Amino acid sequence: MPVLHNRISNEELKARMLAETEPRTTVSFYKYFTIEDPKAFRDSLYVQFDKLKVFGRIYVAKEGINAQISVPQNKFEAFKAALFASHPALDQVRLNIALEDDGKSFWVLRLKVRERIVADGLDDESFNPANVGEYLQADRVNQMIDDPDTLFVDMRNHYEYEVGHFENAIEVPSDTFRDQLPMAVEMLQDNKDKNIVMYCTGGIRCEKASAYMLHNGFKNVYHVEGGIIEYARKAKEQGLPLKFVGKNFVFDERMGERISDDVIANCHQCGAPCDTHTNCLNDGCHLLFIQCPSCAAKFEGCCSEICREELKLPREEQRARRAGRENGIKIFNKSKGLLQTTMHIPAPEEDKDSAN
């Protein structure tokens, strides 16, 4: 019977990946379609992808598949053949190829069955996620972005918007997509007569968001086909001016792809122009924040003096201090509230008041 999960430690796998010289391609894809038996589909896909040395993160649910992976370049055609043949709905599915890629994005294959391929918190049985808005390609995006009767709505999280977004795009300030959906409806209630353009990294969130807006009475709803990744690729191929400024945050070791030369964010510690995300090196924190090279050296990769000092303690004492802390913090903390508390960054309302 084939092994259907990884048995090697993360540390060893990451070291192997960093030492690997074989060229890899980072790619993402998603598809909303009905999978009758997600567990069987997951197991079959795992066996095929494991043989091809595919690394990355893939979620499978009854509603479809969502994947961010890296594939050896010499096995890319075999990977496409396996994927396209895995289900009729995935034949010729669009693949978003990374814009900036050193092949070091992932080091292990994690293929999991989930309730949803993107956590939306929705339990309204009358909601039809297949009834989506109109796709927009790069040329239409550029045409509509300057239209006063059109609003661009960013359906990504606060830390993604902070380092890059479409010109004049509206931020829906939240830590999670599930919170953003009802928030977007509320924020845009007085704009139901306008064109609403939703966008996200690769298309999966804005596609579902467009369906949710239509479900809530909005009529003229669009979403950027393939998200920021596909828009930037097509705009460059077609020689179109880029209407996205800054960096596109990505959920792998790279943490970002440069779209334009603009640096629109600031170091969370000193305020210098910077858009480089990192996780605090203290295992008891792992706060996601923006840190410039100078502060990285000063704080030794930590988000605060407290974390820097804790990192110097003996391992056993560090473990004792971590005991009882929230489990989520140990992995990857992206909370805006904690970011503001730890880094002393004012909330948007406070910042606006101080500027007046």
From Swiss-Prot:
Active site (UniProt): 200
Protein name, as recorded: tRNA uridine(34) hydroxylase
- Reactions catalysed according to its record: uridine(34) in tRNA + AH2 + O2 = 5-hydroxyuridine(34) in tRNA + A + H2O
> Which gene produces this protein?
trhO
Q: Give the domain of life.
A: Bacteria
Q: What class of enzyme is it?
A: oxidoreductase
| Function, in words | Catalyzes oxygen-dependent 5-hydroxyuridine (ho5U) modification at position 34 in tRNAs.
One BP term from GO: tRNA modification
Keywords annotated in UniProt: Oxidoreductase, tRNA processing
The record's family statement is:
Belongs to the TrhO family.
**Which SUPFAM superfamilies does this one have?**
Rhodanese/Cell cycle control phosphatase
Originating organism = Serratia proteamaculans (strain 568)
Under Gene3D superfamilies, the record lists: 3.30.70.100, Rhodanese-like domain
PANTHER family the UniProt entry points to? TRNA URIDINE(34) HYDROXYLASE, UPF0176 PROTEIN YCEA
InterPro entries in the cross-refs: Rhodanese-like_dom, Rhodanese-like_dom_sf, Rhodanese_C, TrhO, TRHO_N
- On whether Oxidoreductase is a keyword of this UniProt record, the answer is yes
